[in-house]
A protein has these predicted regions:
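Acidic (Asp/Glu)-rich catalytic clusters
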Residues: 110-117, 135-151
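A short alpha/beta connector and helix-capping loop motif
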Residues: 106-126
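Charged helix-capping and loop-helix junction motifs
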Residues: 133-140, 167-171
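Short beta-strand and adjacent tight-turn residues that come in two discontinuous sequence segments
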Residues: 123, 153, 213-215
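Positively charged n-region of N-terminal signal peptides that target proteins for export
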Residues: 1-4
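C-terminal active-site subregion of NodB/CE4 polysaccharide deacetylases
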Residues: 21-96, 102-104, 162-245
Length: 245
């Protein structure tokens, strides 16, 4: 009797542990959009430019369409609580994210988002701060102070798959501290350059107590899906109906 009881307790514990451990992998994915450049481009632009650039007019159309279709932006904090702790989400939640620190994300995108009370997640590449075409320190502070989330996109956009052990301080630890000192808030979220990741990167991010890390549209890690949260890159050639799908 005692042996059966003990085995039952062990089985129940393992079942609960396994369920909690794998929970994020079985969650319905929240749509997450990823923008880079927001500017006009010519029909002769390179495929890369077209893939990572959205015109201001198209971006405005997309924000309006999201609002008209009932979408509500959520913070990565809310996404984390949903994935890890089963916290409820509002109807039609969405995250709007931005990579690379581009100045027009502040000067153009935020103005459009403000019309609909949308908040975004801005992943900052710290080497670019204050350079021509990129956000200033003050603009990043304003984003944080007005309800947007600041995340880390490494120091100089080198893919994490190329790092040696010595690179992590340069690319992850110091830039994170720089951003935290700038905004006076924890920086708990990370975006992989080029969407590329490996197991070593996941181990490092976990060791540094990041909550979530974001990729693009590649496959998630089965063991730690919260460190490979997928996003949809919005190409400049997409129509607004395509973006909504």
């Amino acid at each position: 009797m005692k042996k059966s009881l003990v085995l039952g307790v062990i089985f129940s514990f393992l079942t609960i542990s396994w369920s909690c451990h794998t929970k994020p992998n079985h969650k319905k994915e929240v749509p997450i959009l990823c923008y880079h450049n927001i500017k006009n481009f010519s029909a002769k632009a390179s495929p890369d430019v077209k893939a990572y650039t959205t015109t201001p007019k198209r971006f405005a159309e997309q924000m309006k369409a999201l609002y008209q279709n009932g979408y509500q932006t959520i913070s990565p904090d809310k996404l984390y609580q949903y994935l890890i702790n089963d916290a409820p989400l509002p109807p039609k939640p969405i995250l709007i994210t931005f990579d690379d620190t581009r100045a027009e994300q502040f000067t153009l995108a935020v103005a459009e988002m403000d019309k609909y009370h949308f908040k975004g997640v801005f992943f900052i590449m710290t080497v670019s701060i204050g350079k021509p075409g990129y956000m200033t320190k003050n603009q990043i502070k304003i984003l944080s102070q007005t309800g947007h989330t600041i995340g880390l996109h490494t120091w100089d956009h080198t893919a994490v798959t190329h790092y040696t052990e010595n690179d992590w301080n340069t690319q992850l630890i110091r830039p994170r501290k720089q951003l935290e000192n700038l905004i006076g808030q924890p920086v708990d979220y990370f975006s992989y350059p080029f969407g590329l990741w490996n197991q070593n990167a996941i181990s490092k991010l976990r060791a540094e107590n990041f909550k979530l890390a974001f990729i693009l549209s590649s496959a998630k890690d089965k063991t730690h899906p919260e460190f490979t949260v997928r996003r949809k890159t919005i190409a400049g050639t997409w129509s607004t109906p395509t973006m909504l799908k």
